[in-house]
């Protein structure tokens, strides 16, 4: 039964055996895909390529060693790349050299993400990296530039905000005062309300506060300007001309028409009846 239970395994193993002829390294996978370059960190700035070559050639032939430097200053960055000919040698060197003391510093050795490239390509990377760094550094510059626009943004927001909201409230009474001057139509009153307008300007925020706090100041504040401003011109204009206009035509029309209508009627009646008698009496003695 055990022999029969293992019969299906050979086809599975056969598929695996079909992959086995491909070259493989010690740590599995194809040797072509395995990394051959190591990234060595925590190097001293005075470390040279010869120092790394002596310590890493113990594990196999070294193809290339590269110590990158800063593109702008030329100072070493404190790490380097060691590339081996065989990926197995690179794996042994990583295993033994990780934590190794070189020139008084403990090294950290890991596989590089990509195999070591030419120095020209690395320089191009450095330039590109510098650009990327500049781009990374530029956001603070943009932020610094954006520090100047915040007043703009603040202004746009402050129009609806609290900091710049009082000026428009102050401007409203200013716009109302000339309107009141227009309605009054008198320049003499336009100057005197200037003081009242200044009081009104001081009172306008109080009105806003009184509206939010209590309804009583509304009545006291709203009635005082209405009594002082509105009735004075209305009484002068409406009462005086109406009385003068209404009384004069009514008196002139009604009594005059009545006198004229009633006076000539008796005159005509008297003149018609006695005219004959008078003329007869006058004629009689004259003749």
Curated annotation (Swiss-Prot):
Residues 1-34, 116-287 are annotated as: Disordered. InterPro entries: Nucleotide-bd_a/b_plait_sf, RBD_domain_sf, RBM, RRM_dom. Ubiquitous. Mostly expressed in roots, fruits and flowers, and, to a lower extent, in leaves. One of its GO terms (cellular component) is spliceosomal complex. GO terms for molecular function: identical protein binding; RNA binding. Disruption phenotype: No effect on alternative splicing, due to the redundancy with SCL30A. Scl33 and scl30a double mutant shows altered splicing. GO terms for biological process: mRNA splicing, via spliceosome; RNA splicing. Residues 36-114 form the RRM domain. The splicing pattern of the pre-mRNA is regulated in a tissue-specific manner and by development, and changes in response to various types of abiotic stresses and hormones. Involved in intron recognition and spliceosome assembly. Binds to multiple 5'-GAAG-3' repeats found in its third intron, suggesting autoregulation of alternative splicing. May be necessary for accurate splicing of the 3' region of introns. PANTHER family: TRANSFORMER-2 SEX-DETERMINING PROTEIN-RELATED (PTHR48034). Component of the spliceosome. Homodimer. Interacts with AFC2, CYP59, RS2Z33, RNU1 and SR45. The interaction with AFC2 depends on phosphorylation status. This is Serine/arginine-rich SC35-like splicing factor SCL33.
């Amino acid at each position: 039964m055990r022999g029969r239970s293992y019969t299906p395994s050979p086809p599975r193993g056969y598929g695996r055996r079909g992959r086995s002829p491909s070259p493989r390294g010690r740590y599995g996978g194809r040797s072509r895909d395995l990394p051959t370059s190591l990234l060595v960190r925590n190097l001293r700035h005075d470390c040279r390529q010869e120092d790394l070559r002596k310590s890493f050639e113990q594990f196999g032939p070294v193809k290339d060693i590269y110590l990158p430097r800063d593109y702008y200053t030329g100072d070493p960055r404190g790490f380097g790349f060691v590339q081996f000919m065989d990926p197995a040698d690179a794996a042994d060197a990583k295993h033994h050299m990780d934590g190794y003391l070189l020139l008084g510093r403990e090294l950290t050795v890991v596989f590089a993400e990509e195999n070591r490239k030419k120095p020209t390509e690395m320089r191009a990377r450095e330039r590109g990296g510098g650009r990327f760094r500049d781009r990374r550094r530029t956001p603070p510059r943009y932020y610094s530039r954006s520090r100047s626009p915040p007043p703009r943004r603040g202004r746009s927001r402050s129009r609806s905000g609290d900091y710049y909201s009082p000026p428009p409230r102050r401007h409203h009474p200013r716009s109302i005062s000339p309107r009141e001057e227009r309605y009054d139509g008198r320049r003499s009153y336009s100057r005197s309300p200037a003081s009242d307008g200044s009081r009104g300007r001081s009172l306008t925020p109080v009105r806003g506060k009184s509206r939010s706090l209590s309804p009583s100041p509304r009545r006291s504040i709203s009635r005082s300007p209405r009594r002082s401003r509105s009735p004075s011109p209305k009484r002068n204009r409406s009462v005086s001309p109406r009385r003068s206009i209404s009384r004069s035509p009514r008196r002139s029309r009604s009594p005059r028409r009545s006198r004229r209508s009633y006076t000539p009627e008796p005159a005509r009646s008297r003149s018609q009846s006695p005219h004959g008698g008078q003329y007869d009496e006058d004629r009689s003695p004259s003749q």
